[in-house]
Amino acid sequence: MAPRKRGGRGISFIFCCFRNNDHPEITYRLRNDSNFALQTMEPALPMPPVEELDVMFSELVDELDLTDKHREAMFALPAEKKWQIYCSKKKDQEENKGATSWPEFYIDQLNSMAARKSLLALEKEEEEERSKTIESLKTALRTKPMRFVTRFIDLDGLSCILNFLKTMDYETSESRIHTSLIGCIKALMNNSQGRAHVLAHSESINVIAQSLSTENIKTKVAVLEILGAVCLVPGGHKKVLQAMLHYQKYASERTRFQTLINDLDKSTGRYRDEVSLKTAIMSFINAVLSQGAGVESLDFRLHLRYEFLMLGIQPVIDKLREHENSTLDRHLDFFEMLRNEDELEFAKRFELVHIDTKSATQMFELTRKRLTHSEAYPHFMSILHHCLQMPYKRSGNTVQYWLLLDRIIQQIVIQNDKGQDPDSTPLENFNIKNVVRMLVNENEVKQWKEQAEKMRKEHNELQQKLEKKERECDAKTQEKEEMMQTLNKMKEKLEKETTEHKQVKQQVADLTAQLHELSRRAVCASIPGGPSPGAPGGPFPSSVPGSLLPPPPPPPLPGGMLPPPPPPLPPGGPPPPPGPPPLGAIMPPPGAPMGLALKKKSIPQPTNALKSFNWSKLPENKLEGTVWTEIDDTKVFKILDLEDLERTFSAYQRQQDFFVNSNSKQKEADAIDDTLSSKLKVKELSVIDGRRAQNCNILLSRLKLSNDEIKRAILTMDEQEDLPKDMLEQLLKFVPEKSDIDLLEEHKHELDRMAKADRFLFEMSRINHYQQRLQSLYFKKKFAERVAEVKPKVEAIRSGSEEVFRSGALKQLLEVVLAFGNYMNKGQRGNAYGFKISSLNKIADTKSSIDKNITLLHYLITIVENKYPSVLNLNEELRDIPQAAKVNMTELDKEISTLRSGLKAVETELEYQKSQPPQPGDKFVSVVSQFITVASFSFSDVEDLLAEAKDLFTKAVKHFGEEAGKIQPDEFFGIFDQFLQAVSEAKQENENMRKKKEEEERRARMEAQLKEQRERERKMRKAKENSEESGEFDDLVSALRSGEVFDKDLSKLKRNRKRITNQMTDSSRERPITKLNF
């Protein structure tokens, strides 16, 4: 096999993230067997034109996800070679078609494996099968075209793998399945899109790190190789450190990296001669120390290495030398050389060659000397002083104080100037730069805080004033809008009544003229020699004895009603013309019979007995004028599949697998806290009950108004909106009673000594008709809200009645249900011409005889969807039914009555106030007069709407054969609402059953294809593993394992060490640089 050409040392030649300048060398590897990477046989198809070939070849290269250098090399190949490669790849893709070529198959398998929770160990064959499936996925992620990996990512395949890793039991975690799952992630990271997806996933690196808890050495090695390689990827180093911190909590480690050092130190059992794990651990440790922020920051390397030294890594490294493994020794050399280099550079800061970090005395002296003549020295002394004061108890939590201090100092050291932490932040939202800036500007911040507090208070005051003005403006705007609406309605009504008045006046004039003409003719006919009929006659004398003139017609009645007809003429006169039908009368259709003649139905009979539909038949004498006279269910029998209906609902059929292919406020109130208490001053005078006075004080404190302001608001009918509706409701609870007023009058000379509540009640009692004024004001503020609550209920009844009366879909559905019932029921229960609408909710009670999960309702929906698609608009045609079903007519009448009585009470108070002499500032009469005008018309409009709604409801009830006086709207519409809900649920259940069946069929089809192709797949997988080169991520892992990543740095360190040793030989300070045991 021809070796791959490497472009240089270090890691720049390995990973696509680190580009080099060398062009890749493409080699073609042939094998002895029939499976090889690029076959040299001539393509079976002729080569297309060069332009078309380039387009086809470009699509192929895109699927291979090559780097830019490799893409250029591929496009530089001759046209014949391009065509050969294209045909070879397309042939492989054709051979690989099958169940295992679909990412969906592997995702289903992963989900089913992860979902299995069993205490019993898997059988050997089953475990082998699961392992083969995971291995197959790993191979597919490495060898399949780019679209396979993209599809796998789009279907969230990574989350399926991670979920399996998180939920696997102990046996699985110790098996080959665990190793293969890690291999799948590794294979996914060989692809640029897959690698980006893994790194972008919020949990991926953490879940991978959790696999370090296994005892399976191969799995541990694979995990460490992935984590080490991620350290080399931009942005990956910090993710790895965060993952190790996550693993500390997951494995309950005392400190981070504890498990790694323990595994590195183990030398018994399976760990005795296991060099690969120890090499992987040292490779990971070197990657963590030298990459990320460790590339530039000495302080970060010292900080991170100190964690390993505290865990005792140095004695372990000395012991690892006994293995005498060249690859392991290379990693050990790099660790020690980098440590010596860093400690020497750190010592130069203090003009020393070495600092003994095990000596607290030396480190203290160096710190003290450094700060002695600086401004920081007093703070250093303060730190020492307070450290001496730190509480200390052997059994207490004292160590947590020192841990906090340690973490703060660590973060101060490693955090960069931008406030970014290269390591996982031990203290969240702790930005050193911001903290220092705050300390520098502490006095300035204090001043700004005081100024901000002052401005906040001013802002709150302005906000309160603004809200008050907004409330006042909203109230005025609402009043204006209501007045305009009322004015427009009154204008429309006046125009309508004027037109009606003119029409009636014209009718009266016409009738009067006809009456005079008829009377004249009658008189002429009764007088001999009188003018012949048709001759013009003179005026009738005003006083003719025995005159047969009828009295003049009465004037039209108010409201546009017609006057009563004139009295009948004397015998012999022509009969009067027939009068117009009464308003609102419904004329019978032309040719309609006076009685309802029912023709006998021809209903097909089932061959076997069927389950019955428990409906309530409508008596034939109640059919006239209902919807049932317009329904002919015999037409339905020509459309229905009666054999299928008979088979599904047979009374004696055995149960079997069956699937129907079909679709299937209370308000919370706030309570006033009555448990607060207040103390009265010693000299205050209070004659009111203590509990009542206490609650009154609470209310006044919430109002934040003086007694004069409250009094002015009541007299002006709160034109400035100082009193919210809830406060008015509470004020009504504290109206002065007669006993209170008498007591307060006795002590009115001691007004200055009165308590706050007493003074309030006393001053309110001085207002004429205070309680009636307060009630009128509260009613005025609540009127629009109450009307707004009533109108939707009235509108719901009106629109709901119209919808059920006019719905064509409902009528068609009733026809189908009637046909079902007549076909399924026999005897007295059958041969029906209609049924009560409550029977609709009994359809679901009839179960199928072959599947208890299928009801007559499910079957009905199936028929409707297939035969009567127009019925599917039923929910749209009856969209207001749910709201109408919530309306209780008794409560609605009660609300209307409350409005009527409240309005009457306000009118009574208005008449009283008009009779009283006006007081300064009293605007009750003007404000309430205007309100009464608007409110009376609005209430009249509501009453008219309610009357119309009741008429329509009565018409709808009779239309369905019900008795209007015995059924209320909530019950009537509730029947339809319940039925609509049942239909929706049944449609959803049908849809779920359909999806379930399709899913089962798909799984069966995929399993069958998998079984047929298993042998060929095994051969292909083996060929692919041998023929395909390792991906970029594999190259990176391989370089980490061998230590090639650190070759360049190691050579540099050796040169530096040699140079430093030469310098030290010439120096007076002779101190050999050796390994440091910690």
From Swiss-Prot:
Main location per the UniProt record: cytoplasm
Annotated segments matching region Actin-binding: 693-702
Domain FH1: 528-599
Coiled coil region boundaries: 437-526
Residue stretches making up the DAD domain: 1027-1058
Keyword check for Nucleotide-binding: no
Compartmental location: Cytoplasm; Cytoplasm, Cytoskeleton, Cilium basal body
Ranges of residues in domain FH2: 600-1009
The keyword Coiled coil appears for this protein: yes
Chain positions with Phosphoserine modification: S34, S1027, S1030
Reported tissue expression: Expressed in all tissues examined.
GO cellular component terms given for this protein: ciliary basal body; cytosol; glutamatergic synapse; membrane; motile cilium; perinuclear region of cytoplasm; plasma membrane; presynapse
Chain spans, region Disordered: 456-480, 524-585, 987-1034, 1055-1078
GBD/FH3 domain span: 45-420
Biased composition (Basic and acidic residues): 987-1027, 1067-1078
InterPro entries: ARM-like, ARM-type_fold, DAD_dom, FH2_Formin, FH2_Formin_sf, FH3_dom, Formin_Homology, GBD/FH3_dom
UniProt keywords, alphabetically: Actin-binding, Cell projection, Coiled coil, Cytoplasm, Cytoskeleton, Phosphoprotein, Wnt signaling pathway
Subunit field text: Homodimer. Interacts with CIP4, FNBP1 and FNBP1L. Interacts with the SH3 domains of Abl, BTK, endophilin, spectrin and SRC. Binds specifically to GTP-bound CDC42 and RHOA. Interacts with INTU; INTU mediates the indirect interaction between DAAM1 and NPHP4. Interacts (via coiled coil domain) with KANK1 (via coiled coil domain).
Function, as annotated: Binds to disheveled (Dvl) and Rho, and mediates Wnt-induced Dvl-Rho complex formation. May play a role as a scaffolding protein to recruit Rho-GDP and Rho-GEF, thereby enhancing Rho-GTP formation. Can direct nucleation and elongation of new actin filaments. Involved in building functional cilia. Involved in the organization of the subapical actin network in multiciliated epithelial cells. Together with DAAM2, required for myocardial maturation and sarcomere assembly. During cell division, may regulate RHOA activation that signals spindle orientation and chromosomal segregation.
Name the record gives this protein: Disheveled-associated activator of morphogenesis 1
Organism: Homo sapiens
Gene encoding the protein: DAAM1
